[in-house]
Amino acid sequence: MQHLPNDTYDVTLDQFGQIATVYGDPGFPVATDVVGGNDTVTAAVAGLNAKLTIFGDDHAMLLGHSQGGNDTLIADIDGGWDTAIVIGDTQSMIDDSKGGNDTIVADAGRTVYTTISAFGDVAADMSGNAQGGHDDITGSIAWRGGANLFAGDAGGFMMDTSHGGNDTLDVSVLTTDGAATVSGDAIGSLRGLAHGGNDNLTVTLNGGSAISSGALFGDSAASLMDFAQGGDDVLTVKLDGQYAEAGAQMYGDAPTMVGNSHGGNDVLNGGAGRDFMYGDARIYEPATPGSITGGVDTLNGGAGDDRMWGGGSSDFFVFNTGSGNDTIVDFDQGNKAVGSTAVEQDLIDVQGYGFADWTALSKLISDNTAGDAVIHLSANDSITLDGIHATNLHPTDFII
């Protein structure tokens, strides 16, 4: 196995319209048994309309048993109208190649009209039996940023038997009119027998703007297809400011699940804004009735008025004091979305409210004018169960 040296590069872009592409291991050999160096790249952008690209290893395909290095890549953007993309390893990965365990900092928190993206392993696709590294990605976005994309592994698809790493992504939308798309594994679909890693995603929204937003996807920002398997992910939204309207969309696995795909056992923690939370997916297209399997997910909307879908399988909905006026859209009905007749047992956890027993709680449950059960937790907090009547609820539906 050939090992490349550990290199350090410092780059400054301080002129209008400068373009730079930096490689941690330039000229990475086209061979099947090469290990990239543990490189450090620091790039500072002060000019306007600059374009920066950083690869931890090289703009190539990682193949055979080759491995990316454990790189530290820092993009500090302080201009305006800039574009930056940071990739932990290479353009793509195939065979039994492995990504390095990279640390990426993509900071555009002091700019305007700047687009910044970061991918833990590859800019494009992972295929074969490629394995993503365990990467740590930190990003920040400022005023009117563009299509800011962050993924723990691939900027494209994951296919065949490729496997995502166990990644940590922490992205802040720091000012007005900003948005981020954050995926634990890929921006594109997971296909074939691809398997998502067990990832930890956090997005902090600036509550000083009602239009700050984030979209979090445990595995794919597009879909799980074929026999793809989602990882066991943790998604968290935080709100830093006053506007309750600043909210997020959260998908434990992907917006769409197709074929015979399988969701992971995910944990979704909403912020103080208005969140839309899907334990598995929003759209289901099973190959045959019931061929899609949902994970056993835990959804906690936090404060704010949230809407929650657990998806298939038995899920947990957790409510703490100050949880707001929330709606569970598919209580005990998630399997119907995939055409399954299997019985599920969702549970509503209200331990945080300190009810003595079922008798005390049941007195606070009644139907609204639409015939949906409403659980009145306090003067300001409630849970509405779409399509469920109060008489259909029992002590076994709750954790008290």
What are these regions (language model features)?
Residues 1-356:
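Acidic, glycine-rich calcium-binding repeat modules characteristic of RTX/beta-roll
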Residues 362-400:
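Low-complexity acidic/polar repeat-biased segments
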